[in-house]
């Protein structure tokens, strides 16, 4: 047999997290930009990515309430028992956008940044002037073939930096438009060739905080259990007094299996 010691958040722990979410919710209402940094700063378990997502990409408790919130408004705070969290969210924006986008690209990289920019500008100008995209791609050792990107490929992933910049460019570029995109040490000449499956999409900033026990609550539980062990130094005494002390006694038949 063994004793399973469950440490749960105290009323004080929950009240402290509730207060933090209340404060974060008030700040969320007045925040107008850089939601990524703000959501990170309040310790949310749901990071904000500055892309339009399908409704289903957000936590299920947010999805269930999304239609009750208008763009620019804040919903919550509310408790969600399914994941033991206190939450609020803000619908930052809503749009109708393609869920699948076809594109092609030419990656441009030269000896240094100035030469890279000059070469990229030259290729971009040529394509805008009517040059064949695939022929130019082959000239620089690439195929220029088209690829499809769907939202399922990036929704729910950790996206930032150049990846965010690249995906944003694909989403924001019109069909047949060409973009000269600086990415790190290189440039990408990007052309969107097709878009399909238009759906409602959202940008939603979510404050999601688990109601977890504090260090003080854990230390209290540890000390209480240590005192119980000291007062019941034998297995017989522990078994006899565990339930009265509030501990659950369990069988461990598979301990040596």
Residue ranges of predicted features:
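Acidic/polar surface patches and capping/hinge elements
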Residues: 1, 67-100, 184
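Well-structured core secondary-structure elements of compact alpha/beta domains
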Residues: 1-29, 41-61, 87-128, 142-165, ...
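Glycine-centered tight-turn and secondary-structure capping sites
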Residues: 26-36, 68-81, 117, 126-134, ...
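Short, well-ordered alpha-helical segments enriched in acidic and aromatic residues
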Residues: 35-44, 133-142, 240-248
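Internal mixed beta-strand/loop scaffold within catalytic domains of large alpha/beta enzymes
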Residues: 63-72, 161-170
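Short, surface-exposed beta-strand/loop micro-motifs that present aromatic residues
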Residues: 178-180
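Active-site and NAD+-binding cores of ADP-ribose-processing enzymes
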Residues: 187
């Amino acid at each position: 047999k063994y004793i399973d010691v469950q440490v749960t958040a105290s009323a004080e722990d929950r009240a402290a997290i509730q207060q933090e979410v209340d404060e974060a919710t008030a700040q969320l209402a007045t925040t107008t930009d850089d939601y990524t940094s703000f959501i990170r700063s309040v310790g949310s378990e749901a990071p904000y990515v500055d892309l339009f997502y399908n409704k289903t990409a957000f936590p299920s408790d947010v999805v269930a309430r999304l239609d009750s919130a208008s763009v620019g408004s804040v919903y919550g705070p509310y408790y969600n028992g399914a994941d033991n969290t206190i939450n609020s969210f803000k619908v930052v924006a809503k749009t109708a956008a393609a869920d699948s986008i076809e594109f092609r690209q030419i990656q441009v990289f030269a000896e240094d940044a100035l030469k890279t920019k000059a070469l990229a500008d030259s290729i971009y100008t040529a394509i805008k002037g009517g040059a064949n995209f695939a022929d130019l791609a082959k000239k620089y050792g690439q195929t220029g073939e088209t690829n499809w990107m769907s939202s399922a490929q990036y929704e729910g992933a950790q996206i930032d930096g150049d990846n965010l910049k690249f995906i944003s460019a694909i989403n924001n570029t019109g069909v047949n438009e060409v973009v000269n995109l600086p990415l790190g040490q290189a440039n990408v000449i990007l052309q969107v060739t097709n878009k399909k499956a238009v759906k409602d999409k959202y940008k939603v900033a979510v404050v999601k905080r688990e109601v977890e026990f504090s260090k003080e609550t854990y230390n209290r539980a540890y000390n209480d259990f240590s005192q119980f062990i000291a007062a019941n130094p034998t297995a017989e005494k522990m078994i006899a007094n565990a339930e009265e002390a509030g501990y659950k006694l369990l069988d461990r038949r598979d301990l040596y299996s």
